[in-house]
Amino acid sequence: MVFFTCNACGESVKKIQVEKHVSVCRNCECLSCIDCGKDFWGDDYKNHVKCISEDQKYGGKGYEGKTHKGDIKQQAWIQKISELIKRPNVSPKVRELLEQISAFDNVPRKKAKFQNWMKNSLKVHNESILDQVWNIFSEASNSEPVNKEQDQRPLHPVANPHAEISTKVPASKVKDAVEQQGEVKKNKRERKEERQKKRKREKKELKLENHQENSRNQKPKKRKKGQEADLEAGGEEVPEANGSAGKRSKKKKQRKDSASEEEARVGAGKRKRRHSEVETDSKKKKMKLPEHPEGGEPEDDEAPAKGKFNWKGTIKAILKQAPDNEITIKKLRKKVLAQYYTVTDEHHRSEEELLVIFNKKISKNPTFKLLKDKVKLVK
């Protein structure tokens, strides 16, 4: 956006607001641009569409600003608008609109955006006028490329030098030249994609070649192994050429035999350890049978010899040994089960079944009396 200063009052004004300012400030005859400092008399300010940037202003003498593609297109678009104003067949309403449009430097170049811009900035909502303005623009833009093509065409037909050269040059070189021209025309993305495809193809080809070589190398080895097996089965000796392969097979067999022997030794050691552990457990669990009372004969209720376990007799014997014929259920259970394990040896039941039997024997027998956590022998 271009800004001007009034030389009469010194007020800074946008390009769009100049007409309003002229109607207010009567002495306004000359306007000067804030950026470049040029003076514009009368209506000359309308042609000053774009000014220098801050980089160009403060960059020094040798500074050259970069030209943006969008700015070049915008300038061409605004020039087209100024050319359309001069046409005789344009209606006065449309001409006024075109004059207002030429004051802007950000005019859209597409129909939908252009019409929205007209509605917002110029407050034109009549669709017929909007269509008329756009049709004039589209006609002007379509007529330009036709004129350019006519200017570019040569007046006299010139002989094509490439045709004469192609007759002399061989076909292979011509193809290469055509491919090079096609590569030049392609975009950077297309070139990149082609390179990636070529690399992928090369990788695939290398993989296939390596795979084929490996398969060729593996086949003769398999055949040699098969021949050796056949010779061994027939009882024939392996030839000297294949002596190394025979030695390897023998070594493998020896290793397998030694490994099996070691496994057998380890298994035997483990069994011995388990047997010793079981014996130690049984020794720990063993308890001495209750001793006979002094000066008397052994009773019938005491624990019997190994074989069938006498629950009632063992419980009675343990209670008699206890002070006041009374003992806690926990201690009694421990002693009875220990005695059970010593009698039955290996053929004993699970702990759950033993606990159930123990509880039944205590609760149902009238000779045993339960007092909370203790058991007492009733005489």
UniProtKB/Swiss-Prot annotation:
Phosphoserine PTM sites in chain numbering: S215, S244
Keyword Secreted appears in the UniProt entry: no
Ligand binding (Zn(2+) 1): C6, C9, H21, C25
Tissue spec: Predominantly expressed in testis.
Segments forming C2HC LYAR-type zinc fingers: 1-26, 28-52
Superkingdom field: Eukaryota
Chain positions recorded as Zn(2+) 2 binding sites: C33, C36, H48, C51
Pfam families: zf-LYAR, Zn_ribbon_ACC
Cellular component GO terms held in the UniProt record: cytoplasm; nucleolus; nucleoplasm; nucleus; photoreceptor outer segment
Coiled-coil annotated spans: 175-219
MF (Gene Ontology): DNA binding; DNA-binding transcription factor binding; identical protein binding; RNA binding; transcription regulator inhibitor activity; zinc ion binding
Biological process terms in GO annotation: erythrocyte development; innate immune response; negative regulation of innate immune response; negative regulation of transcription by RNA polymerase II; positive regulation of phagocytosis; positive regulation of transcription by RNA polymerase I; rRNA processing
Chain intervals with Basic and acidic residues compositional bias: 173-196, 203-216, 256-265, 276-295
Keywords: Cell projection, Coiled coil, Cytoplasm, DNA-binding, Immunity, Innate immunity, Isopeptide bond, Metal-binding, Nucleus, Phosphoprotein, Repeat, Repressor, rRNA processing, Transcription, Transcription regulation, Ubl conjugation, Zinc, Zinc-finger
Region annotation (Disordered) ranges: 161-307
Biased composition (Acidic residues): 229-239
Chief place of localization: nucleus
Swiss-Prot/TrEMBL induction comment: Induced by MYCN. Induced by interferon-beta.
Subcellular location(s) of the protein: Nucleus; Nucleus, Nucleolus; Cytoplasm; Cell projection, Cilium, Photoreceptor outer segment
Sequence position, cross-link Glycyl lysine isopeptide (Lys-Gly) (interchain with G-Cter in SUMO2): K14, K207
Function according to Swiss-Prot or TrEMBL: Plays a role in the maintenance of the appropriate processing of 47S/45S pre-rRNA to 32S/30S pre-rRNAs and their subsequent processing to produce 18S and 28S rRNAs. Also acts at the level of transcription regulation. Along with PRMT5, binds the gamma-globin (HBG1/HBG2) promoter and represses its expression. In neuroblastoma cells, may also repress the expression of oxidative stress genes, including CHAC1, HMOX1, SLC7A11, ULBP1 and SNORD41 that encodes a small nucleolar RNA. Preferentially binds to a DNA motif containing 5'-GGTTAT-3'.
Subunit details: Interacts with PRMT5; this interaction is direct. Interacts with GNL2 and RPL23A. Interacts with nucleolin/NCL; this interaction is direct. Interacts with phosphorylated IRF3; this interaction impairs IRF3 DNA-binding activity.
UniProt comment concerning the protein's domains: The N-terminal zinc-finger domains are required for the appropriate production of 28S rRNA and the formation of pre-60S particles.
Name listed for the protein in its UniProt record: Cell growth-regulating nucleolar protein
Lineage: Eukaryota, Metazoa, Chordata, Craniata, Vertebrata
